[in-house]
Design a protein with these regions (language model features):
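ER/Golgi luminal nucleotide-sugar-dependent glycosyltransferases, focusing on the catalytic module
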Residues: 1-231
Length: 231
């Protein structure tokens, strides 16, 4: 698959190789044991501090001992998020980003680059406080719930995902399927972004063929991955 991943359109490859997976909602003791072998880093950009409780509750399905790096935009938010982390007994840190340019992606790739590149973690869980205030409220809530539920639905759900990483060293990333309820993404999810994305890919020396209409992508920029797969 590693060669195919470099030469095939991503959505064609996922379809033809049957790489869409319905995650079981129960897990055996062996599955939990395999999941526990993975050192898990969670990175959460919490721009909306009032969502800190919701995010910590979602992350509570991760194996005990995970480490959280939360990023936010100011010191007031930082103190509020720290207080929530203390209530949940979560080990970690809260960083104030130098700029909100790039939003959660900039905070992840720039402000958290040191932990991502440290080699200390087997798995990184990336989420953020998603409100999509520019969209219809109900559609935005469905989008957020779609992402949270597909990645962090329950302890058994997460254990099955982590066990897959443990069993398959070539597995690089798990992501939610295309969100489409309330959004016109089916059949034309690139919108106006295809040409700019191709220009950036050319600058970076990425030669993987692009999907024509619906890119296989982490819509909402939330996923579970190996840090090495991001470089």
């Amino acid at each position: 698959l590693s060669n195919l991943a470099r030469t095939s359109k991503p959505r064609d490859l996922v379809t033809n190789a049957g790489l869409t997976w319905v995650v079981p909602q129960s897990a055996s003791e062996e599955t939990y044991a395999a999941a526990a072998t993975q050192k898990v880093l969670a990175v959460a950009h919490i721009f909306y501090a009032d969502m800190a409780e919701e995010i910590l509750e979602r992350l509570s399905v991760l194996p005990k001992g995970y480490y959280l790096v939360a990023t936010t935009s100011n010191e007031e938010n930082q103190a509020q998020i720290r207080a929530v982390m203390e209530r949940y007994g979560v080990e970690g840190e809260v960083r104030v980003v130098a700029s909100n340019r790039g939003r959660d992606i900039g905070a992840f790739l720039v402000d958290c680059n040191d932990v991502l590149a440290s080699g200390k973690w087997d798995i990184v869980v990336k989420i953020h406080s998603k409100k999509s205030v520019q969209d219809d409220y109900n559609a935005a809530q469905l989008f957020k719930t779609h992402l949270y539920d597909n990645l962090l639905n329950s302890r058994a759900h997460v254990a099955n995902i982590l066990a897959e990483f443990a069993a398959h060293p070539a597995l690089g990333m798990v992501l939610a399927p295309l969100p489409h309820m309330g959004y016109p993404t089916m059949g034309h999810a690139w919108f106006t972004n295809r040409e700019p994305a191709q220009a950036v890919a050319k600058r970076l020396g990425i030669n993987v063929p692009f999907d024509k209409d619906m890119p296989l992508a982490t819509y909402g920029s939330m996923f579970i991955a190996r840090p090495q797969a991001l470089t």
